Structure formats: C-alpha cells, structure tokens
C-alpha cells in the first residue's frame, strides 16, 4: 500500500520519521516530505505546518504526487472534557469545523455547503482496536473532534465550543481540512490525536511542556496501524 502521513509540526514528524525505514527527504516549495518504507508499505510523511489551509495544501501534495491509498493525520489536540488527561489518545469517529457558520442559509454550524455537517473517519481502525484492545493494551477515547484556525487557550472559549458542539471532546487546527480534501477525492482517512493541554488559560505553557509526550504516544499508535493496515 501507499500511505500518506501528515503531521503539523517538527515534534510530531520527528518521532514518525524514526519508524520509517530508508527514507529520503524531498522538498516541495516549503513542504518537507520524507519518503521511505514500512515493511511492504510505501510511506510518504509530510510536515504540513499549522492550520487548515496549510494542512489542505499538504494533503493535495500527497494526493497529486503520490496517489496514496490511505492518509493518516497524527497530531496534538486540546481537551474540551475534564475526563481527558495529558497523553490520552483520541480516535475520533467524526470531525468538523467550529469556525464555519452558514446557519443563516440553513446549514448546520460547522458545515461547508456541498459537504456533510461532519466528516466520518476511522471506521475500520475503531473496529480493529476494539477487537484487539487486550493484545495491544493501548487505551483510547472515541468522539467528535473540532478544527479551526485558533489555538484555543481560554476557559471562556471552551464554554462557547461546548455549548455549540455538546458532543465534542477535543479541538485542534488541521483534521477537518484534511478530512474535507479526502472526502472530495474519496481517500480513506485515519485521524489519531493525543491530548497536549486542556484548552484553558494554561494551554500555551502546557502544550510546550507536553508535546514530546504527545508525539511519543502518537508514534506508538501509528506504528501499530502501519503494522496492521492491510488487515483492517
């Protein structure tokens, strides 16, 4: 299989590079791509940069140049629920934008015209991890993840998001944009996130302190996915 992997920042991609064999580095404009192998898979790891547009461009680069069979987005997220702890893994069932509002035209908050109100992801890997939970002994939480072009870092912002999206459990800045592109081109998408902060007034400091822990947790899950992707 040909597998594209997207991480937003250095800490996320550096960990992932260590599980790719014999990679070479290529640069497309400002985007770094690491091309290598994982067992029989051809792997294309790209550092997208932060935010929705950067993530969309990175996704299109992978699709245009390498025609991946599956894309994996791995990265950090801020918690919207008190039961989530630093380093917890989120495998979302759905993702949507929190900063899109066309409700005056009859659309659901977060919905782009011509697209579903939420993007469904991870159906196969949710079933896989459910069946193999004892084998791998890795805990994860399922739920809705929100995306937008703001690093959420205020208690008041959390209240607003929870009111607008009661079922959301975490928030970040790339996954819905990647999901929109994959939806358009009918490419299966796997999203794995790990909690770096509580999206509160201490979020900036906590993110910096915890990003290495988060990246380590993510790399473990991504490796398991790569090892078992054909069987999912």
From Swiss-Prot:
Tagged with keyword Secreted: no
GO biological process entries: L-methionine salvage from methylthioadenosine; L-methionine salvage from S-adenosylmethionine; purine deoxyribonucleoside catabolic process
InterPro entries given in the database record: MTA_SAH_Nsdase, Nucleoside_phosphorylase_d, Nucleoside_phosphorylase_sf
GO molecular function: adenosylhomocysteine nucleosidase activity; methylthioadenosine nucleosidase activity
Keyword vocabulary terms for this entry: Amino-acid biosynthesis, Hydrolase, Methionine biosynthesis
Pfam families named in the record: PNP_UDP_1
GO cellular component: cytosol
Enzyme Commission code: 3.2.2.9
Residues annotated as the enzyme's active site: 12, 197
Pathway terms, separated by semicolons: Amino-acid biosynthesis; L-methionine biosynthesis via salvage pathway; S-methyl-5-thio-alpha-D-ribose 1-phosphate from S-methyl-5'-thioadenosine (hydrolase route): step 1/2
Positions contributing to substrate binding: 78, 152, 173-174
Reactions it catalyzes: S-adenosyl-L-homocysteine + H2O = S-(5-deoxy-D-ribos-5-yl)-L-homocysteine + adenine; S-methyl-5'-thioadenosine + H2O = 5-(methylsulfanyl)-D-ribose + adenine; 5'-deoxyadenosine + H2O = 5-deoxy-D-ribose + adenine
Subunit structure: Homodimer.
Family listed: Belongs to the PNP/UDP phosphorylase family. MtnN subfamily.
Function recorded in the entry: Catalyzes the irreversible cleavage of the glycosidic bond in both 5'-methylthioadenosine (MTA) and S-adenosylhomocysteine (SAH/AdoHcy) to adenine and the corresponding thioribose, 5'-methylthioribose and S-ribosylhomocysteine, respectively. Also cleaves 5'-deoxyadenosine, a toxic by-product of radical S-adenosylmethionine (SAM) enzymes, into 5-deoxyribose and adenine. Thus, is required for in vivo function of the radical SAM enzymes biotin synthase and lipoic acid synthase, that are inhibited by 5'-deoxyadenosine accumulation.
NCBIfam families: MTA_SAH-Nsdase, PRK05584.1
Protein name according to UniProt: 5'-methylthioadenosine/S-adenosylhomocysteine nucleosidase
Organism of origin: Buchnera aphidicola subsp. Acyrthosiphon pisum (strain Tuc7)
């Amino acid at each position: 299989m040909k597998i594209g992997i997207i991480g937003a920042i250095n800490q996320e991609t550096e960990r992932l590079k260590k599980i790719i064999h014999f990679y070479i580095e290529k640069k497309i404009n400002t985007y770094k791509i690491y091309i290598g192998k994982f067992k029989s898979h051809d792997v294309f790891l790209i550092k997208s940069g932060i935010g929705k547009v950067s993530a969309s461009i990175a996704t299109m680069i992978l699709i245009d140049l390498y025609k991946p069979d599956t894309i994996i987005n791995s990265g950090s997220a801020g918690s919207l629920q008190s039961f989530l702890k630093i380093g917890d893994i989120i495998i979302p069932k759905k993702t949507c934008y929190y900063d899109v509002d066309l409700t005056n035209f009859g659309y659901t908050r977060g919905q782009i015209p011509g697209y579903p109100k939420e993007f469904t992801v991870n159906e196969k890997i949710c079933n896989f991890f459910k069946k193999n939970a004892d084998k791998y002994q890795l805990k994860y939480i399922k739920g809705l993840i929100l995306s937008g072009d703001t690093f959420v870092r205020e208690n008041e912002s959390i209240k607003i998001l929870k009111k607008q999206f009661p079922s959301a459990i975490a928030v970040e800045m790339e996954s819905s944009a990647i999901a929109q592109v994959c939806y358009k081109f009918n490419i299966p998408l796997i999203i794995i996130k790990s909690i770096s902060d509580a999206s509160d007034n201490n979020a900036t400091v906590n993110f910096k302190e915890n990003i290495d822990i988060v990246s380590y947790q993510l790399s473990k899950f991504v490796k398991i996915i790569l090892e078992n992707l054909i069987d999912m």
